[in-house]
A protein has these predicted regions:
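An N-terminal assembly and electron-transfer interface module characteristic of large anaerobic redox
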Residues: 1-178
Length: 178
């Protein structure tokens, strides 16, 4: 079976903000894909005893025989390499498609009402900066809901998560073609 790695911000696990990630993982599994979700901090932080994305990818998506995944879905906002102590050549040596999942910084109603769709901030964080990593673009799969009192949650756009899952499957199939 095809294997999909999903890179998830460690902070979302700490804050219990996982509804959108659960819907994405369910959408991938509905397509009969094996999924390895991995929580990671974007850069190594010795104070918090956390590794960076490159170490997390190496530890969980690779074994002694090689890469375990056919495609990587990155749900971390921003670039994986720009302004971070991460070696961009590491991602090139993976030789795996990396899909950038868009987590909107606006609520669903604003996004749907906006004829331009994504805001300049969304475009910068989700599209422009990740382009430096050589990622493949996908679709918004989640939006931000501000519940007040510093309670911000990210909620799923279920139909978009399904589209993202289908795109991941197609890229995984394409990667295996001789």
């Amino acid at each position: 079976r095809l294997m999909v790695g999903v890179l998830i911000p460690r902070e979302e696990w700490i804050w219990g903000d996982l509804a959108h990630q659960k819907v994405l993982i369910e959408a991938l599994r509905k397509r009969d894909l094996n999924v390895i979700p991995v929580f990671s901090h974007w850069a190594a932080d010795p104070i918090q005893h956390s590794t960076g994305v490159d170490t997390a990818i190496e530890n969980y998506f690779r074994d002694k025989t090689g890469w375990r995944i056919d495609v990587l879905v990155n749900t971390l906002k921003f670039s994986l390499t720009v302004g971070r102590p991460v070696n961009i050549e590491f991602f090139q040596t993976m030789d795996r498609p990396i899909l950038q999942a868009y987590n909107l910084l606006q609520d669903e109603a604003s996004w749907r009402a906006n004829p331009e769709g994504m805001t300049p901030l969304d475009l910068s964080f989700s599209i422009s900066l990740p382009e430096f990593d050589g990622v493949i673009h996908s679709v918004p799969y989640a939006y931000k809901e501000d519940r007040g009192a510093n309670d911000i949650r990210h909620l799923p756009l279920a139909e978009r998560a399904g589209f993202l899952a289908r795109k991941a499957e197609k890229w995984a199939i394409l990667r295996r073609k001789p």
